[in-house]
Amino acid sequence: MVNVLLAGGISMAVALLCTKPFIAFLVRRRWGQFIRDDLVHHHVKRGKPTMGGAVIIGAALVGYFASHAVVLALGATGVLKVVRSSISLGALLVLFLLTGLGVVGFLDDYTKIRKERSLGLTSRQKLLGQTLVTVVFALGALLMTDEQGLSPASTAVSFIRDTDIDLAFAGPVVAVVLFVAWSNVLIAGASNGVNITDGLDGLATGASVMVFGAYTVIATWQYNQGCGVAPGPNCYDVRDALDLAVLACAIGGACFGFLWWNASPAEIIMGDTGSLSLGAALAGLAILTHTQLLLVVLGGLFVIVTASVIIQVISFKLTGKRVFRIAPLHHHFEMVGWSEVTIVARFWIIAGICITAGLALFYAEWLTRG
């Protein structure tokens, strides 16, 4: 689709061109990253410009809205016949997640800079911010319907499609409460997963490019095989699928452009401004494309890295011994002696395998229904 590619191309160009001036701005203000004392390999990165996620968010917003404007102009002039998707509620809700968690991440990054420490907001403050943003998203996704009475989200727990597990088993009120709680689990888990993975130059950014690329493919496929376009036993009843593909490509393109400056040796770090917002956007896309649990496969790298932290904490509390030299997992391999570039490359390979497996499951499920 022209608008999908436009969104990705515009956002990539904006991120590529605007990150360097943003780095200069941060350097002038001396807004740099503080590093944990036990990460001896990273002391050289102390003071490196952070909050790069602001560029990703800004570029994604520009790419998304500019692509709609360009496609609208092309359609009006008749220069090019395109399938145009209007700005949708679903995409706006994901953008709300992106910017809302971006604000939470910005406050965390700014607190680190102002107090000159590696820890920003407290866990309780972060959780409160994530919860407030999630509640607004979840209520909008579930309760705001279109002319056909279809809401962007469903009360059913989904894997590749909605499953038989329906949160509305005890009535509509309980369904709303459970959906908000379930959304909070997904969004908090995804945002913190990306946040934990963002420990090496380019690692989380490159992995995010792949996952957003996967959701671009998934949402585009859902549109092309939608029940309103291609009725059949394997069609998808997903609202705003094409526009979600536009947005996924815009965010992925923004990450791709930012990666030019974030790859080793990074000139800027995305910070919590980027990691929390990107994880939340991924969870939002998973919820609205009805592929909630498939995100566990697609974002398998984030799951593995997060699991390493959980395993380390549980092991130390129960036995007093550590499974890894240090957690998260990528820092363990640094302590073992792997170079940063080697770790990132190999973890990207793992991310690619997870993406391939997730897309294969998605396509295989469609084939079995045909």
Where do the PLM segments sit?
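Juxtamembrane helix-capping/reentrant segments at transmembrane boundaries
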Residues: 36-49, 116-129, 335
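Alpha-helical transmembrane segments
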Residues: 1-29, 58-106, 110, 134-162, ...
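Juxtamembrane linker/hinge segments adjacent to transmembrane helices in membrane proteins
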Residues: 22-44
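Membrane interface segments of multi-pass transport proteins and intramembrane proteases
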Residues: 112-122, 159-167, 339
